[in-house]
A protein has these predicted regions:
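Generic structural signal for short, solvent-exposed loop/turn connectors between secondary structure elements
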Residues: 25-27, 98-99
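Short, solvent-exposed secondary-structure junction/capping segments
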Residues: 27-28, 61
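Local sequence-structure signature of Cys/Sec-based thiol-disulfide redox active-site neighborhoods
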Residues: 1-22, 28-33
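Thiol/selenol-based redox catalytic cores and closely related redox-interacting motifs
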Residues: 35-132
């Protein structure tokens, strides 16, 4: 799988993280998951790298809360279906760099991504994302 970033072009948090970590200095393929939804192969690859589909689900998503999913006993199959159903269920951004996967906006994840890219704090990139 090539180095790729799954993100929402309209998400301020995604844009902030990508700028902070200077991803524009690396040859990534960008996929806006709103206009180009994830396919089964992509979701399965992410789960294979993280060990579960659940680890890729954004449990803070409004849709997750509205459906009361936190109160349900969901299986990994259920989490896979959610990821394929709607982009809002994916923790984002997701950055695949070589054999590493970074998902979400947790400070430790963002710091690990910056380190993997060889960037230190304060070495922001331009924040430019591809025009879609």
């Amino acid at each position: 799988m090539p180095d790729i970033i799954y993100y929402l072009s309209t998400c301020d948090t995604c844009r902030k993280i990508l700028k902070e970590t200077a991803t524009d200095r690396h040859a990534f393929t960008y996929q806006d998951i709103r206009t180009e939804p994830l396919n089964e192969k992509q979701v399965d690859e992410m789960a294979a790298r993280t060990g579960s589909y659940e680890s890729m689900v954004n449990k803070r998503a409004i849709l997750y809360k509205e459906r009361g999913l936190a109160k349900q006993q969901l299986t990994d199959t259920d989490f896979r279906k959610l990821l394929l159903e709607h982009y809002t269920f994916l923790k984002r951004p997701v950055v695949i760099l070589g054999d590493q996967l970074f998902a979400g906006n947790d400070k430790k994840t963002v710091a690990a991504l910056a380190a993997a890219l060889g960037n230190s704090a304060g070495s922001e990139g331009t924040g430019r994302l591809p025009l879609l």
